[in-house]
C-alpha cells in the first residue's frame, strides 16, 4: 500500500461559509454588508490562511509523487497575521465602512475556553521534498472570497 498523510491548516477560499466559526469568510461577509466584525479576546491571536487552490495543488503533488510515499506533510501557508490585523485588512480590501467589535472570551464561550494564541504550520518538509510553496497571499485570498460573495 502506498500511504501518504497530510495535515491541512486553515484552508480558505471562495464558496466557504462562516457558519462554523471560519474567521475569513465570516469577516468578509460582514464587511460586504458593512456590519461590525467581531474579534474575540485581544485580537492578538496569530493565524495563517492557505487558499484552497494552493492546498489542492499541494495535495496533487503529494498524491502524484513517489517521494511522498510513507510521509506526512503539513499543507498550509506560513504568512502570519493577527486576527485584529486580519479584520483591518478585510475592511480595507473590501472598501467597507464596518467597525471592529472586540468581544471578551467570557461573553462568547463557555467557562474554561482557551484559544490557541499562535497557529503556524511548518511547511519546510513539503517544500524540501516536493518543492511546494503556497503562491496565493492573504490579500488575494480576501479578494477572491469577496468577489465570489459579491456575485
Please give the residue ranges for each predicted region:
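Generic structural signal for alpha-helix termini and adjacent loop/cap motifs
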Residues: 30, 34, 62-66, 129, ...
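Short aromatic/basic micro-patch
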Residues: 5, 49, 80, 120, ...
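Mid/C-terminal beta-alpha module of Rossmann-like enzyme folds, strongest
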Residues: 31, 65-111
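Conserved small/polar residues in nucleotide/adenosyl-binding loops
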Residues: 1-2
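Glycine/proline-rich active-site loop of Rossmann-fold NAD(P)-dependent oxidoreductases
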Residues: 11-25, 35, 40-44, 52-53, ...
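Amphipathic terminal alpha-helices
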Residues: 125, 137-151
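Conserved C-terminal active-site "lid" loop/helix of NAD(P)H-dependent oxidoreductases
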Residues: 52, 72, 106-133, 137
Amino acid at each position: 500500500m502506498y500511504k501518504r498523510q497530510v495535515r491541512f491548516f486553515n484552508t480558505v477560499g471562495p464558496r466557504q461559509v462562516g457558519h462554523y466559526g471560519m474567521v475569513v469568510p465570516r469577516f468578509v461577509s460582514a464587511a460586504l454588508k458593512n456590519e461590525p466584525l467581531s474579534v474575540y479576546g485581544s485580537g492578538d491571536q496569530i493565524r495563517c490562511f492557505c487558499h484552497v487552490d494552493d492546498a489542492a495543488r499541494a495535495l496533487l503533488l503529494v498524491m502524484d509523487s513517489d517521494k511522498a510515499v510513507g510521509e506526512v506533510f503539513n499543507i498550509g501557508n506560513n504568512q502570519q497575521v493577527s486576527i485584529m490585523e486580519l479584520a483591518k485588512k478585510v475592511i480595507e480590501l473590501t472598501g467597507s465602512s464596518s467597525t471592529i467589535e472586540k468581544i471578551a472570551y467570557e461573553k462568547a464561550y463557555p467557562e474554561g475556553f482557551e484559544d490557541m494564541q499562535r497557529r503556524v504550520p511548518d511547511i519546510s518538509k513539503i517544500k524540501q521534498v516536493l518543492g511546494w510553496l503556497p503562491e496565493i497571499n492573504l490579500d488575494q485570498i480576501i479578494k477572491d472570497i469577496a468577489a465570489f460573495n459579491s456575485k
